[in-house]
């Protein structure tokens, strides 16, 4: 029987013993790319209106950079899990493992995204059919579309989306160990089934912990953004709002990166504990 308290204690031990290695990986793969993307976004968008430079190839560059940042984030998460799974793993070994398993992780993520898209088709069809303009979805057109469909279709859409959210929460819990499985077991599509088996009996615990961590993360991020933003604005003045936004984003990125390290370390140790219990049983 896996106890979450024991797993959390192991997680704390991992973060205390391997803090420097975890921090260096997070800084290079999570924090720095995110800050660079934010700087580029501020260069393209001033006070909410796209600048002339953003109308051409610059937006394509930003989109490409966003893809690179997303890939680096996946790479960083895999490397963090590799470090947190085995105390003998070095930084170089963790990075090599992450690089080797990155295509699998991206492929499974795309496969999951495709499945989610397919599940979203039924409620989208009646809304799209009632859209006044086939191209360009806006809040106003969405409102017109929802008013234009029948009561039965609205009820179906609302009920479907409610069930969809519940299913997504359940799936998120059952797939919480997917990345640790990808890193440690060298499997492909079978990683989905393996994650389901390892998370059996832990679903509600994982959901509860995820909700708790989500609340804590939201509070930390909002508090950091508000307090740091005010401090930087007082120091730099109202004439440097772009720099204030960039520095605030950099500090907030530190908080989000730290929270990611905590979660990756936890799921890695949860995987280790569950695998040990499974092997013993």
Task: Report each predicted region and the residues it spans.
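Hydrophobic alpha-helical membrane segments
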Residues: 1-281
């Amino acid at each position: 029987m896996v106890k979450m308290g024991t797993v959390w204690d192991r997680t704390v031990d991992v973060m205390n013993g391997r803090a420097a290695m975890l921090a260096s990986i997070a800084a290079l793969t999570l924090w720095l790319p995110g800050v660079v993307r934010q700087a580029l976004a501020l260069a393209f968008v001033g006070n909410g209106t796209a600048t002339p430079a953003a109308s051409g190839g610059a937006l394509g560059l930003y989109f490409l950079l966003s893809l690179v940042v997303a890939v680096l984030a996946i790479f960083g998460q895999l490397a963090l899990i590799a470090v947190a799974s085995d105390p003998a793993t070095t930084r170089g070994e963790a990075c090599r493992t992450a690089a080797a398993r990155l295509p699998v992780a991206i492929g499974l993520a795309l496969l999951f995204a495709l499945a989610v898209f397919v599940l979203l088709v039924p409620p989208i069809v009646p809304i799209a059919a009632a859209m006044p303009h086939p191209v360009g979805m806006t809040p106003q057109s969405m409102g017109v579309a929802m008013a234009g469909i029948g009561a039965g279709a609205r009820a179906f859409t609302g009920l479907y989306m409610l069930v969809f959210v519940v299913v997504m929460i359940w799936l998120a819990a059952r797939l919480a160990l997917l990345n640790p499985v990808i890193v440690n077991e060298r499997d492909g599509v079978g990683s989905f089934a393996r994650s389901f088996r390892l998370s059996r009996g832990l679903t509600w615990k994982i959901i509860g912990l995820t909700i708790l961590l989500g609340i804590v993360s939201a509070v930390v991020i909002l508090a950091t953004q508000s307090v740091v933003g005010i401090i930087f604005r007082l120091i730099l003045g109202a004439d440097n709002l772009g720099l204030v936004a960039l520095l605030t984003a950099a500090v907030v990125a530190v908080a989000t990166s730290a929270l990611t390290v905590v979660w990756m370390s936890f799921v890695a140790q949860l995987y280790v504990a569950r695998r040990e219990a499974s092997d013993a049983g």
